[in-house]
Amino acid sequence: MVYLPLQSFVLCLINISQEGNSMITQELKDRLIADYPKFEDMTHKFYKKEMSIADYKGQSGAYGSYAERGANSGMSRWRFNGGRMTRQHMQFLADSIRKHNLQHVHFTTGQCLQMHGLDGDTILNLYKECYDHGIYNRGAGGDNPNVVASILRGIDPRETLDITPYATAISEFLLEQMFYIKIPRKFKMGIDNGFDSTPHATFKDLGFNLTKHNTFDVYACGGIGPNPRIGIPVAHDVQPEDVLYHVKAMLMVFANHGNFKNRGKARTRYMPAEMGGAEAFIKTYEETLAMVKEVEQLTINPADYAYEITKTGKRDNSVENDRIHRQKQEGLYYVEYHPAGGDANVEHLLSALDYAVTLDQVEARIAPDQALFFINLTADEA
């Protein structure tokens, strides 16, 4: 067991101005790039055949990159909070495709982008260029993957609460916590809006399922793969502003009770049995949650992360089809691009990006089913 004093993980909240609906501090930004030289060194060694595939994989994943079969090329994984790509991100993606001649662009189930078939220098250049454009890939391929969120959050005509502020807050919180809490293996999270189940919140390592009361039911220790498990309900009717307390509590339980000795059994879904069963796990979870609430101030102010869609259009039902659907905003629509297996046709993607960046308030979102959605379009734009 790894003992982690609660006090050593107290989050230091700094009052900073909003930047693109983000509360990431400059201190954290600096930390996300501080160990880039280590990544640079290992990548140069690997592509010079001075490091084994296994050794490289064990380290490079923390920087969102893995070697590909044959060890002559690799991939670069780009992390987007809940799959959201701003207009600036879309322009950067289009520019990068052209600059680096990217031929294999893949949409992942974790709402990330992956660029395949890259040489070492391109991987390193993309890592730095992504950072300069507010895309933080540190941890994206390691034990701290992207938080998956409902793709239609904020625009779904059925929803009663926009979960965007809470999904963003969780994503940014995890970026900071990965430097403080050592967990034995990857920790997948999902948050949904109560209608869209694609985040699979009920069978993630930790998941938040929105209820009809605009509160969250919380599930833990779920997952697919070997020993698949539906998540254990650990809390009901949690106020949205309180979700970070549950994130911190689960991270600490995983750090203290996860299996560091056997990587094959290091995921959270193995943990309850090793702790004596679901009841024993829930008891520990609740005790840890109480301690976190006593020591830390992690209540979310949704206004810090929210952004308003002010664009409107004229409703035109004739444009709706299998790929074009109506948003809850007056006269606005979203378009779905769903390539087979999530592998984009680069020419088609570039055409879409080039057009989208010319439009007001349009953004793209990568879906958990490996599609790309362009949202906030008028009927004519769609």
Segments predicted by a language model, with ranges:
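N-proximal short alpha-helices
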Residues: 58-66, 99, 143, 216-223
